[in-house]
């Protein structure tokens, strides 16, 4: 044999009991110009039961490790290893093989560069008959004496090659002839001659040998790169990364096993394999903080465990409830899939209305659900109700309807007993939690029903079940000594009487026995969990329980300012136990570290100056400040909710200066003592000629100290004053003379005077300022008095009240003028 031979051996110890070793040999003769075929060798201990060989090299799921073939390691203690090597023989005449690489002398041959010797018989292509192990002379002598005493005829492969013939075991009485294997050496083992023990392994091996000649695929012919030699690792060190890789592969293929909330083992296992980002993990974080996670048993099944995979795909269409109008159903499209969550888009509307839900949300339904249940479906623009059909719509949009099996079936749920459409009750206004109002049941779906406040818009509606702490039977306020808010425009609200009202409306009250008592939750302060960031719903962050009530918890995002804390229901679908993101494949935002909060920005960029440098002639725009300067912000989301990303401070939803611009989501999140803000006004999505929709919020007198607490930084300069540099340290009074001339009726009026205005006085001022009675009537319809008028922002005036931009700028700047003339409102 001439030329250099390279070998690669794939060795994987599968178990300690059998000591099975898989070896992948690839022989290449560098001197020959012809292609080499890979040879797969499987080294099997004598006590191995069954051998299963892959059909191709790609079926072997173990990493290849290059091994210097010298002294072969023993496995399972001192048990010798007997190998059966099945070479990939080719029928070609000029093709080299492993058989040709061996230096044959008689019926046996050594493998060049190693201590292994092989022989050929008529049943198996190659049998390894010995392995050389480096031993001391004393050990060699003692080993030879022990073998002679035991009668074992193992050859000593460390002898010279001239004694090869004498190394072959003689055929004597100790040799047994197996019907399946032929003449074999017993080696001191009790091997029967019937072949019962080896017939089945032999048949399997024969099939493999026969099929091995026809598995010469293109993948097997590809050359294999020689790996670098790795240092030896202990079996525990070797098996650990392999177990992790194999476990990950299995988790990706198999269905998640259903678990119960009491299964704490699931929680602990998820902490170990939790989401890691920049070296962060739940396990190390809990150890560092000396904290504990909220037990899985405290969460609802829909919050803690996902029994099904998220099978929704991009572009799938379905039906769902509008979160802003819970009584309306729209056609939705899956715009994004992240873990077990979906971002849904309203067909025919701007993406600024997109919202996130869990895949097991009860608010989404398959296509055609509205027809079966008798609900009305809000169609995209350009479609008529009498002409719409799902099949035609899917064809025209070239889309696919989400399969029905992806939706969480609630058909088995028991309908709420005692709650029927039209029945009356008393319910808490979740946007104004201090108010309890007259309400009705307007819809029943599965185990939930829709609560609607009489004579008010549907933006205040919400879905609940009989155990909700926000609903009460008729007469509850009177028993508790609390005021009851009657329906809007009720003739005599001070003398409202339930008996009279039920008789006038021809309705009945929900029976008292229909209401269920929900036990308080068991969350404790400082427990850790995972929660959706309400300012940027695409993100889930590490959170802690800051405070608790009977049915609500106050959450704090670890590492962030307490300005972002908020209240949420304990059964809200936006909170999950620790490890939920890891289990569902959703990214988890780790806590903001002190080094991050102290840094100026994630990119190390200095804060934005008030006056941007002029653009150079070589570039159309200045891209220096492309990263958001807010510490810990990754640039996702937008303060207006219309965009998925931002790159400046003005659009950051996490910036403290933008907190007043965020839409106030009071349901489930604010305390009853929170002052009512006009930002809760219902958006006008319907034409004005259809009348006012929604109800005006109720206001209470706000102490002056609360108004004094408003920082000047929350008062943003409007576009009307964009001609002057917006320096934070420049007082607004320097612009007074310039802008007072453009705002008639503003001069000489202070904020303290405006705060005492009635609704009619606000109406008259806006009419004088804008010169339009229609614009002023909007303020009158919403019952905005002077105190509420001062709390309006430009976004409230333009987006919520639907005032045109020109008049809105005048009104908002007039409010700024009022505030800056009174020290108490600055």
From Swiss-Prot:
**Which positions bind Zn(2+)?**
628, 633, 646, 652
Instruction: Provide the positions where the record notes the PTM Phosphoserine.
Output: 136
What Pfam family is a match, any one? MBT
The UniProt entry, under SUPFAM superfamilies, shows: CCHHC domain, SAM/Pointed domain, Tudor/PWWP/MBT
MBT repeats, residue ranges: 280-380, 388-487, 496-591
Superkingdom, according to UniProt?
Answer: Eukaryota
Cellular component aspect of the GO annotation: chromatin; chromatin lock complex; condensed chromosome; nucleoplasm; nucleus
What are the residue positions of the site described as Positioned at the entrance of MBT 2 and is required for recognition of monomethylated and dimethylated peptides?
Answer: 432
Q: What sequence ranges are listed for the domain SAM?
A: 757-821
Q: Which GO terms describe its biological process?
A: chromatin organization; epigenetic regulation of gene expression; hemopoiesis; heterochromatin formation; negative regulation of DNA-templated transcription; regulation of megakaryocyte differentiation; regulation of mitotic nuclear division; regulation of transcription by RNA polymerase II
Q: Name one GO molecular function term.
A: zinc ion binding
- Record remark on domains: The MBT repeat 2 specifically recognizes and binds monomethylated and dimethylated proteins. In contrast, it does not bind trimethylated proteins. The MBT repeat 1 does not bind methylated peptides but inserts a proline ring in a Pro-Ser-Ser/Thr sequence context.
Q: Would you tell me the protein name for this molecule?
A: Lethal(3)malignant brain tumor-like protein 1
């Amino acid at each position: 044999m001439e030329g250099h031979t390279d070998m690669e051996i794939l060795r994987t110890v599968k178990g300690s009991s059998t000591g099975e070793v898989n070896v992948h040999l690839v022989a290449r003769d560098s001197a020959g110009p012809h292609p080499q075929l890979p040879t797969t060798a499987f080294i099997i201990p004598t006590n191995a039961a069954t051998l299963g060989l892959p059909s191709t090299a790609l079926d072997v799921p173990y990493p290849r490790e290059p091994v210097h073939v010298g002294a072969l390691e023993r496995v399972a203690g001192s048990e010798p290893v007997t190998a059966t090597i099945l070479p990939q023989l080719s029928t070609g005449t000029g093709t080299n093989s492993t058989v040709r690489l061996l230096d044959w002398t008689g019926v046996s041959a050594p493998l060049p560069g190693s201590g292994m010797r092989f022989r050929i018989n008529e049943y198996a292509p190659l049998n390894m008959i010995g392995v050389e192990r480096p031993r001391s002379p004393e050990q060699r002598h003692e080993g030879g004496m022990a073998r002679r005493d035991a009668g074992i005829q193992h050859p000593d492969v460390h002898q010279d090659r001239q004694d090869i013939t004498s190394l072959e075991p003689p055929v004597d009485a100790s040799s047994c002839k197996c019907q399946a294997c032929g003449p074999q050496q017993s080696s001191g083992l009790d091997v029967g001659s019937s072949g019962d023990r080896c017939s089945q392994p032999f048949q399997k091996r024969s099939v493999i040998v026969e099929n091995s000649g026809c598995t010469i695929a293109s993948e097997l012919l590809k050359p294999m790169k020689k790996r670098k030699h790795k240092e030896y690792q202990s079996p525990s060190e070797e098996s650990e990364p392999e177990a992790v890789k194999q476990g990950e592969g299995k988790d990706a293929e198999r269905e998640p096993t259903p678990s119960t909330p009491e299964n704490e083992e699931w929680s602990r296992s998820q902490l170990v394999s939790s989401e890691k980002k920049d070296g962060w993990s739940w396990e190390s974080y809990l150890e560092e903080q000396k904290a504990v996670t909220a037990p899985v048993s405290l969460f609802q099944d829909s919050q803690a465990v996902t029994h099904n995979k998220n099978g929704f795909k991009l572009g799938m269409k379905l039906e769902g409830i509008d979160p802003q109008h819970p009584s309306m159903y729209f056609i939705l499209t899956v715009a994004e899939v992240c873990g077990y969550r979906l971002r849904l888009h309203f067909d025919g509307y701007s993406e600024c209305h997109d919202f996130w839900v869990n895949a097991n949300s009860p608010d989404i339904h398959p296509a055609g659900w509205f027809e079966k249940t008798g609900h009305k479906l809000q169609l995209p623009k350009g479609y008529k109700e009498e002409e719409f059909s799902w099949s035609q719509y899917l064809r025209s949009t070239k889309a696919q309807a989400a399969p029905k099996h992806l939706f969480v079936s609630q058909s088995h749920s028991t309908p709420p007993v005692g709650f029927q459409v039209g029945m009356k009750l008393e319910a808490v206004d979740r946007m104004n939690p201090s108010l309890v109002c007259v309400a009705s049941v307007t819809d029943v779906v599965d185990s939930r029903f829709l609560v609607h406040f009489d004579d008010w818009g549907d933006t205040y509606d919400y879905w609940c079940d009989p155990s909700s702490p926000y609903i009460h039977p008729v007469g509850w306020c009177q028993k508790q000594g609390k005021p009851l808010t009657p329906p809007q425009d009720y003739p005599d609200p001070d003398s409202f009487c339930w008996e009279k009202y039920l008789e006038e409306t021809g309705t009945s009250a929900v029976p008292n026995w229909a209401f269920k008592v929900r036990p308080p939750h068991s969350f404790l302060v400082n427990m850790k969990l995972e929660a959706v960031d309400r300012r940027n719903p695409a993100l889930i962050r590490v959170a802690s329980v800051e405070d608790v009530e009977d049915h609500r918890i106050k959450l704090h995002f670890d590492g962030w300012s307490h300005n972002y804390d908020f209240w949420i229901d304990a059964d809200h679908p936006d909170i999950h136990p620790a490890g939920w993101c890891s289990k569902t494949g959703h990214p988890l935002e780790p806590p903001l570290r002190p080094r991050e909060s102290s840094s100026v920005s994630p990119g190390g960029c200095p804060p934005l100056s008030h006056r941007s440098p002029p653009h150079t002639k070589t570039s159309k725009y200045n891209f220096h400040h492309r990263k958001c300067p807010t510490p810990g912000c990754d640039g996702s989301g937008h303060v207006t909710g219309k965009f998925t990303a931002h790159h400046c401070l003005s659009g950051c939803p996490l910036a403290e200066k933008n907190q007043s611009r965020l839409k106030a989501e009071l349901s489930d999140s604010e305390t009853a003592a929170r002052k009512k803000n006009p930002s809760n006004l219902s958006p006008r999505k319907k034409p004005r000629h259809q009348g006012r929709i929604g109800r005006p919020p109720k206001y209470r007198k706000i102490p002056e100290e609360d108004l004094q607490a408003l920082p000047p930084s929350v008062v943003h300069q409007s576009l009307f004053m964009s001609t002057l540099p917006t320096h934070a340290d420049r007082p607004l009074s320097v612009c007074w003379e310039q802008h007072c001339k453009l705002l008639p009726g503003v001069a000489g009026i202070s904020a303290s005077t405006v705060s005492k205005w009635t609704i009619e006085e606000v109406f008259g001022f806006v009419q004088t300022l804008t010169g339009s009675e229609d614009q002023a009537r909007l303020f009158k319809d919403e019952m905005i008095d002077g105190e509420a008028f001062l709390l309006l922002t430009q976004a409230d005036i333009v987006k919520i009240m639907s005032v045109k931009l020109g008049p809105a700028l005048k009104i908002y700047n007039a409010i700024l003028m009022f505030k800056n003339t009174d020290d108490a409102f600055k």
